[in-house]
Each structure stands twice: as C-alpha cells, then as structure tokens.
C-alpha cells in the first residue's frame, strides 16, 4: 500500500448512499473532504450527527468530512467527485462553475453511471462541457455503498486518458479493504456502467416473474454480449467489458438485493406499474432514465440491442413482461458469437 497520498483534499458532490460512502473512503485515506448536498436539512443533520440517516445510516462519518448545502461556500480542492443522478450532473456542474470555486487544476471524477438523455453524452463529457480545461476521469465497478460502509472487500476501476492522473485517483482509493485499478478506456468504462443498469432491470423482471436460474443466467450472459457489442460500437475496447466496470458490475447488479435497478425490475415483473414504483421508491434507479437514453443512442447508431429494446418497451410502452420474454425467445436463431 502506498505510504503517501498525493492529493490532500476533495469535494464530494452528492449526498446519496454512494456519495456518503465515497466521502468516508477518502476521509479514511487521510484527505480532508467537503461533502455537498442540495438538501439543507439533510446536510445540517449530517454535519451535526456525523451520519446520513436518510441514505446510509449504518456509516459514521469521520471528523474530516465537512457537510454543507451551500455550493458557493466550497473551497478549492485537489479532487472533485460528481456523485449525483445522471439527470442532475449538468446542473450541478453549471452551479459549480458559476460559483467560481475551482482553480483549474482540480481533477474531476464522475462516479455516476449514465448517459444524458438530451445529448447522448457520457458523464465526463457533460462535466467537461461545463468545466473545461480540467482533467477528467470516471470511477466505476461493482460497488454497493452498503457493503463499502461495512468495510467489506471491494474493487473498482478509475478510467482516465492521463495515466498519471489515474494513478493519483487510484492512490486516494487504495485501502486495506478497497482496491482500485486503472485504465485509459474512459469510453468503455462509462458505456459499461450505463448499460449494466438496464440489464439489471431485466434480471429483476425475470425474478419478479419467478423465472429460474437458467433463465437469469441466460439473460445475464446475453446482456454481457450486448453490452460489449454496443460499447465497442461507441468506441470502447472489448476487454473493458470483461473487467470490473463490465462483467463485474453487471453480475453484482443483476444478482444483489442491494441493487436498486434489480429491485425496480422485480416489482415490474410482479406487475407493479412503473409510476407506482417510482413514486414509492426513495432511491434513484438510474436504469429507468438510462434505458430511454441508451435506446435513443442505439437507434441512432444502428446497433442491435434486443434486450435493451424489450426493457424499453416494458418501461415506456407498457408492454407486458411475459410478452417481452416471449418475443425475446421467439427471435430468429443466431450464432452465439453474433
């Protein structure tokens, strides 16, 4: 384990469960952390009680974590993590730019898995639009905040075109129970992270329909093939989809009860309408808006995505899950590698 941390300070934008876990990880590594969320009551409570009772009550935050709801009061830091829902990334980046908090030397890291609906841009592209002339990276992998809070062993990958920047982020997230790898395939990592959300919904739908292990294994395996086909067509490298941000994250989200996307899918498979699921769920399941974004991108790129198409039809065209499963199985036979 490295004996020194090259970055000494960080800003974490987003006070959900994952943002809370990441703030704790950085503080554990010795960084001073400014932790921002837009909800004044929540952030005041976190600052007073060192705990995010709403989203991750099991985790006690270190004294080195300073919570605030005022983005204009943030101070410059070495590292800035964006951990807000994908639909809010641009707004938060614009607010940060307008507040003139940053010096220009900060490394900006997207920890959000998604594609912007209006533009089809990856999260680092959205951040770069609003905050140009900064280093950009993406952190991804099979990480549930609940397990990170318990210091259970986990691993992630940081993607950055600049290998020296990637190593700096890697160092910040190197702990006895957390291992971070590096890659320069930012495109592949971000597409993998967005796509797996959709396929986690499909696995949840299968569970909600009480389908067996055979069906779920088939779905997950074909989802990986579809992820790689789609992601490489967008410029990612094939091997990335066999790594932590690809198959690693896919397996975790498709099989874990911690997965919000899986839980949404399960309720859909049981027949609950999407509107009811959304209104009754406090946490954001990124796979729901991501499905629409990715469906548009797939049609524009001319990529064959049968699983994505059926999840889209269930979510946005009210297609019954049983009919979607029938249509998947009744497609023309193909070679497995196709």
What residues fall within each predicted segment?
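NAD(P)-dependent Rossmann-like dehydrogenase/reductase catalytic/cofactor-binding core
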Residues: 196, 203-207, 232-242, 246, ...
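Internal alpha-helical scaffold of NAD(P)-dependent oxidoreductase catalytic cores
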Residues: 100, 126-134, 153-201, 205-240
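Rossmann-like NAD(P)(H) cofactor-binding subdomain of soluble oxidoreductases
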Residues: 61, 67-153, 169
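NAD(P)+-binding Rossmann beta1-loop-alpha1 motif at the extreme N-terminus of oxidoreductases
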Residues: 1-59, 68-69
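General beta-strand structural signal in soluble alpha/beta enzymes
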Residues: 110, 135-140, 180-184, 242-243, ...
């Amino acid at each position: 384990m490295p004996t020194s941390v090259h970055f000494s300070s960080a800003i974490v934008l987003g006070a959900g469960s994952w943002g809370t876990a990441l703030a704790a990880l950085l503080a554990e590594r010795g960084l001073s952390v400014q932790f921002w969320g837009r909800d004044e009551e929540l952030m005041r409570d976190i600052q007073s009680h060192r705990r995010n009772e709403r989203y991750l009550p099991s985790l006690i935050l270190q004294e080195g974590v300073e919570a605030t709801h005022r983005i204009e009061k943030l101070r410059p830091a070495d590292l800035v993590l964006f951990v807000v829902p994908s639909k809010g990334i641009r707004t938060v980046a614009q607010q940060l730019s307008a507040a003139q908090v940053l010096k220009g030397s900060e490394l900006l890291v997207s920890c959000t898995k998604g594609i912007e609906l209006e533009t089809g841009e990856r999260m680092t592209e959205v951040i770069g639009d609003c905050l140009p002339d900064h280093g950009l990276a993406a952190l991804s992998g099979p990480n549930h905040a609940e397990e990170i809070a318990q210091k259970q062993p986990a691993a992630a990958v940081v993607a950055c075109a600049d290998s020296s920047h990637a190593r700096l982020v890697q160092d910040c997230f190197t702990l006895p129970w957390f291992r971070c790898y590096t890659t320069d395939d930012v495109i592949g990592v971000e597409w993998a992270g967005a796509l797996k959300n959709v396929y986690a919904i499909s696995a949840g739908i299968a569970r909600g329909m009480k389908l067996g292990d055979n069906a779920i294994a088939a779905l997950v395996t074909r989802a990986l093939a579809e992820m790689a086909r789609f992601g490489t067509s967008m410029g990612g490298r094939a091997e990335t989809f066999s790594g932590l941000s690809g198959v690693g994250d896919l397996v975790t989200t498709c099989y874990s009860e911690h997965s919000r996307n899986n839980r949404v899918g399960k309720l859909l498979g049981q027949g609950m309408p999407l509107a009811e699921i959304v209104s009754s769920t406090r946490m954001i399941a990124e796979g729901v808006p991501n499905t629409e974004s990715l469906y548009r991108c797939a049609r524009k790129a001319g990529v064959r995505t049968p699983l994505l198409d059926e999840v889209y039809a269930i979510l946005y065209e009210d297609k019954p899950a049983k009919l979607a499963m029938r249509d998947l199985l009744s497609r023309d036979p193909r070679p497995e590698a196709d």
